[in-house]
Amino acid sequence: HYENFGPHCIPSCLVVTGDIDLSAHAQTLGMAGGPIPNNEPLARHILETGYADDIDWAFSKSLGVDHSVGVPYHMSLKKLPGVRIIPIYLNCVVAPFIRNRRAYQIGQSMLRAVQSWSGDERVVVFGTGGISHWVGGPGMGHVNV
């Protein structure tokens, strides 16, 4: 996403291990901005498990997020007490794209991380992006089918 990284630095795969903020894109999306709670310990565990699995994660200790995180959070999770998120990005936007096999390996590593996590949180994965959504317009929240 150019909104997150610009055209100058597009990571193949990235996990956000720190602060998450929607402020920069909130007005465009028509929603309240501000911080979004991150499950930092689990994010670091996913990162470290990935490194042990030879996943070459990039990581961000602070990231202003756009519609790809803000809309699902706002519509599904914001009103639930205690819910924390971990944004994870795979480059499917700018060539060279992450290879399917590598994306699968990352998913398997994430599964191992969650299964080996000592916490008692329930973990849900949201897949967002692609050409399946209207961003910042009157159709926001509806799937383009």
What are these regions (language model features)?
Residues 1-145:
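Soluble secreted/lumenal catalytic domains
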